[in-house]
Design a protein with these regions (language model features):
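Active-site acidic catalytic loop and adjacent metal/ATP-binding pocket
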Residues: 40-50, 56, 90, 190-232
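A conserved alpha-helical element in kinase catalytic cores
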Residues: 59-106, 124, 128-132
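Short Pro/Gly-enriched beta-strand edge/turn motifs at strand-loop
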Residues: 22-31, 187-198
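ATP-binding glycine-rich phosphate-binding loop
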Residues: 26-48
Length: 232
């Protein structure tokens, strides 16, 4: 069973808040409030202090690999080495990854990061300035990742954007023009990408810079989040 099949963590927020204070010294004497953020296979919580300082706690799916989570932390740290990118990625606040038992007694990895306060790209009114900001940061990100490689990035992963052929088995879920568009995309991928894959340059990528993983404020991109799909 993979993280895509396993039920996300089931958390009692009050009990988890107590656990946070017991295990992280920077929360021990703080009055904190927790609220849920959007997430698919994990649980993400926003932590607010009375001082208005905010954090994100990521409680990973019980089936998530600890090695893969450590890889994500290394990836974020590498991106933050670039002075032009440092503020675009959350700062990792935990010294090591701890584990919390959820309500079903499953062992779930816990990580603490700074919170990037803004709106999701999907819910923002974006302008040419926003698009230019996005293009510039994606280019800087790609350049920075050229000097980063770990074994964990080289993996078999269903959502690998360099091989979309697996989507063909779902094509009959669509009809008409939508089906034709998808079929043409798969055919062009087969012809121009997959047949030439060995001749194309490779590098570690974010893997999923979709419009719910990009943070915007005042028509400017201020953050990239969620590196769970990163791949070489």
């Amino acid at each position: 069973m993979s993280v895509f099949d396993e039920q996300p963590p089931i958390i009692n927020v009050s009990a988890f808040s107590k656990w946070l204070k017991e295990n992280y010294s920077f929360f021990k004497l703080k009055d904190i409030k927790l609220s849920r953020l959007n997430s698919e296979r994990d649980i993400n919580l926003l932590i607010k202090e009375k001082s208005a300082k905010k954090y994100v706690v990521k409680i990973s799916n019980p089936k998530e690999s600890i090695v893969q989570l450590e890889y994500q932390d290394l990836l974020i740290k590498h991106l933050r080495f670039n002075r032009q990118l440092k503020q675009i990625y959350p700062k990792i606040l935990h010294n090591k990854i701890l584990f919390y038992q959820d309500s079903k007694q499953r062992r779930c990895a816990v990580r603490i990061l700074t919170y990037i306060d803004g709106d999701m790209y999907a819910k923002s009114k974006n302008t040419d300035h926003t698009e230019q900001s996005l293009g510039r940061l994606l280019a800087l990100q790609s350049t920075q990742l050229q000097s980063f490689i770990k074994n964990q990035a080289i993996r078999k992963f269903e959502w690998n954007p360099s091989d979309i052929r697996w989507t063909e088995k779902f094509i009959n879920l669509f009809i008409g023009n939508n089906k034709n568009i998808i079929k043409n995309s798969i055919d062009e991928h087969e012809k121009f990408v997959f047949k030439n894959i060995k001749n194309l340059k490779h590098a570690v990528t974010h893997g999923d810079p979709n419009d719910y993983n990009i943070v915007v404020k005042k028509e400017k991109i201020i953050g990239f989040i969620d590196f769970g799909d990163s791949i070489y």
